[in-house]
Amino acid sequence: MEIKEKKKLEVTVDKRHIVSIGERLYAESVELLRELVNNAYDADATEVRVEVSPAEVTVSDNGAGMDFAGLKQYFIIGSDEKVIHSRSPRFGRVRIGQFGIGKFASLAAASRFELLTRHKDFAARVVFDKKAWEEAKDEWHLPCEILNSDPQRGDGTAVILSELSKAFLVEDVERKLMETVPLKAPDFAVYVNGRRLYPRSLVGRRIPLLEGTKYGPVNGEIVITPKSAADFKDLGIEVKVRGATVKKDLFGMETWGKAVARVKGEINADFLPITSDRSSFIVD
């Protein structure tokens, strides 16, 4: 068939889908706080403070912060910045973020997303208002206010979620963060309403694990806890990628009966490909 004429078609995206990325990405609203805390870890923060109230949730850190170029990079959907630069500059941490969409998860539970950041002599505030964003159909920019910088305050970033559409319970936030952020990492502390979170400590017989595979190393520890410590509400072994728990797995122990409640521990396998919501692994 002969070509009569050549034309080009423009590929467009409805702005509403930017919001729906966050609304559909996570099953639990508390999971979005995991993303914000892990962003702080990637930014070389040594301290992250999460403040939860009925009116708003704030996640602030003392990490590197962002300059204007960093802010522009932050709001690129699907950015591979953390894949290209997979280690943080100060501590050499293996960065957890991979997909560049986690920040939009905040819109699943809040209509207003305010970001304040400081980096050296630069400071700025960006506001993402869901209603204003959807109403301005042809406007793809976010208001960014350049602020007077106070060097004495140091670098860092704060995210304030307000006009909440979902409630955050402090105990749920603590539980989720204790399960899914790298609390064992050196020089990294996380606080929720002023209370520091610590990684879970297990008592029992410890079995170290180290296995080489063609994809990369697998390491960790299995703990056989006493019968008195058996926990049927928290079954499975944590599988971690880049220091953050992705899921818990029984690894075929479903038929073990009551004994399965005594087997705990964690396995680290940084080479495993994970889904965009970090809840499972990609299986081909």
Q: Language-model features: where?
A:
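Glycine/threonine-rich ATP-lid/beta-loop region of ATP-binding domains
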Residues: 149-236
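GHKL (Bergerat-fold) ATPase N-terminal catalytic module, capturing the glycine-rich phosphate-binding loop
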Residues: 1-158
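Residue-level detection of beta-strand-connecting loop/turn positions
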Residues: 54, 121, 192-196, 241-243
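Short, charged, solvent-exposed linker or helix-capping segments at domain edges/interfaces
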Residues: 125-127, 139-140, 170-173, 276-281
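Glycine-rich, charged/polar anion/phosphate-binding loops
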Residues: 100, 143-146, 174-176, 221-225, ...
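Short amphipathic beta-strand/extended segments with alternating polar/hydrophobic composition
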Residues: 125-131, 138-139, 196-206, 246-253
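Charged regulatory segments coupled to nucleotide-binding catalytic modules in large multidomain enzymes
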Residues: 1, 7, 11, 169, ...
